[in-house]
């Protein structure tokens, strides 16, 4: 299910709303990429020729949220010195796994929320000055980490899939 709406609510102002409901599950998937009994303990292998093969049938696909929503507002205000452009967006995703394994606190996030905003003055002489904040809700820099399980030979890691909060000023001049 996808819903996309854009509304012009005033001179130079638009509101965008996007919503998706995604029911992405494996019909059949025998994961024989490793011996999964090291992670899950004893179970019946889905492939008799591959010890520790694990059936993911009916499981949700990784990196696919169940619900996704984006709300954004943009405004352009012409002035004597140039345009002032203001933008803000909020993104919400629910029940998202960052891998095939859904482990609470490691590879599964109940929600991922992102807030971005910026204000830009685009001067008539080709210079622009922009103040911005991206991923402003991630104060602890901990959004969307995932765990890679160690193999029998060792390894394992944490991976971050989204950048942390960034804020700053940017000046651009076009020659």
Predicted regions and their residues:
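Residues that define the transmembrane beta-barrel architecture of outer-membrane proteins
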Residues: 1, 65-69, 111-115, 163-167
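Gram-negative outer-membrane beta-barrel transporters
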Residues: 1-100
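Outer-membrane beta-barrel pore domains
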Residues: 57, 111, 173-175
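Feature captures outer-membrane beta-barrel proteins of Gram-negative bacteria and organelles
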Residues: 69-71, 75, 117-119, 169
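Short, glycine/charged-rich beta-strand-loop motifs at protein surfaces that mediate ligand recognition
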Residues: 102-108, 116-120
């Amino acid at each position: 299910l996808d819903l996309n709406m854009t509304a012009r609510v005033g001179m130079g102002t638009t509101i965008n709303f996007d919503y998706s409901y995604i029911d992405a599950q494996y019909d059949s998937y025998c994961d024989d990429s490793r011996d999964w009994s090291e992670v899950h303990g004893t179970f019946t292998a889905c492939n008799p020729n591959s010890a520790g093969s694990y059936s993911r049938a009916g499981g949700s696909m990784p990196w696919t949220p169940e619900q996704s929503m984006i709300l954004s507002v943009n405004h352009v205000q012409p002035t004597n010195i140039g345009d002032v452009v203001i933008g803000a967006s909020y993104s919400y995703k629910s029940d998202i796994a960052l891998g095939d394994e859904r482990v609470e606190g490691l590879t599964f996030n109940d929600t991922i929320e992102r807030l971005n905003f910026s204000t830009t003055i685009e001067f008539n002489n080709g210079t622009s000055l922009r103040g911005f904040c991206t991923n402003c809700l991630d104060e602890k820099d901990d959004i969307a980490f995932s765990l890679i399980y160690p193999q029998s030979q060792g390894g394992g890691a944490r991976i971050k899939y989204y950048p942390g909060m960034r804020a700053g000023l940017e000046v651009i001049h076009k020659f």
